């Protein structure tokens, strides 16, 4: 039976091309038009509400229509909305840069502003390459990336990604990247457990660095969680050993904290848990609490000095975006950081993370099609499998995660899947009752789906 569309849905399907979507799916399952947000909830045209368990693609930290952030944005909009950022600056950007330098690892002293996560990755890749070109290491023209990595969808970012869903069609256009097998604690090739392993799988990276370090400019990694690959989580010792290898072989380390930064892993930045300082740190998403697009690339004085010279040397970093250092976004980011500090939200996230872990383990551990529930900080993931003992994956063509996602929406819960992995990444303001609803509804939906599937 064909669904009756609202006027806005009809106009949407007539003109809008949605991201990461097969638009033909929308004929049977049209986009939900959201009219307002409040706290962890999104409300559609019929005032049906949905608990935003994915923080609207991992960006929202302190709730939709947060009064404090909205007020800061409004006040700034009546003073200065934007200004060119070449030869000009403004107070919110200056204060934000100063604050980020104070919060991140000590060696990160310079802040370059960009618009979004993919843009930040492009900046870091270009900076690293140009640094080596300008310091006499002209043979360093390749990057090393991990299998199942995701760093964005521009061509440079895709070049260091490893998820075929996004990469495969563009392969002829991508950079010649060195690949190393990444960590997979659920299906560990060494049969180790992440709580007690010594990151033996770092040997895959070490082998590639030993062979190719003279031509590698940087290794890029998502610290602690390979998010888009299905929330693949690994221990901090892997990061520590990777930092040691990068130093040993004279290659940069780029930490892509776009998804995991700003408290998601239980510390303000994931790199803190390994006590490492990367050469570049890319930040976005939670930086503005889900309000406005903004990203930054943080780097060292050593990198900065390789570009600092007389104009005639042509060593400047000639990269820009029209909305670089947008005033509104910077002001919002300052308010987000103030909320973290004044309301001690890292402690809140850690406490709520333990509550979520307890509820989730009770709910999912004994379900026959759940291979594993895993969690780092305030990110939880349910890996659905065909066989718990062998960890055999479910057939991707059945789109089981997508089927569960649709059923959950009908129950008022937004849990957009990653293949056959369902995950929780809710706003930090979620209450205990809302968390209980999120987990119980997910369990009920999984059970309902597999009962229907088995007939």
UniProtKB/Swiss-Prot annotation:
PANTHER family: ADENOSYLMETHIONINE-8-AMINO-7-OXONONANOATE AMINOTRANSFERASE. One of its GO terms (molecular function) is adenosylmethionine-8-amino-7-oxononanoate transaminase activity. GO terms for cellular component: cytoplasm. Substrate binds at residues 57, 150, 285, 320, 416. It catalyses: (8S)-8-amino-7-oxononanoate + S-adenosyl-L-methionine = S-adenosyl-4-methylsulfanyl-2-oxobutanoate + (7R,8S)-7,8-diammoniononanoate. Inhibited by KAPA at concentrations higher than 0.05 mM. The gene is bioA. Pyridoxal 5'-phosphate binds at residues 117-118, 256. Pathway: Cofactor biosynthesis; biotin biosynthesis; 7,8-diaminononanoate from 8-amino-7-oxononanoate (SAM route): step 1/1. The keyword S-adenosyl-L-methionine applies. Catalyzes the transfer of the alpha-amino group from S-adenosyl-L-methionine (SAM) to 7-keto-8-aminopelargonic acid (KAPA) to form 7,8-diaminopelargonic acid (DAPA). It is the only aminotransferase known to utilize SAM as an amino donor. The keyword Transport does not apply. This is Adenosylmethionine-8-amino-7-oxononanoate aminotransferase. It is found in: Cytoplasm. The record marks 20 as: Participates in the substrate recognition with KAPA and in a stacking interaction with the adenine ring of SAM. Its EC number is 2.6.1.62. It comes from the Bacteria. Homodimer. The modification N6-(pyridoxal phosphate)lysine is found at residue 285. GO terms for biological process: biotin biosynthetic process. Pfam families: Aminotran_3.
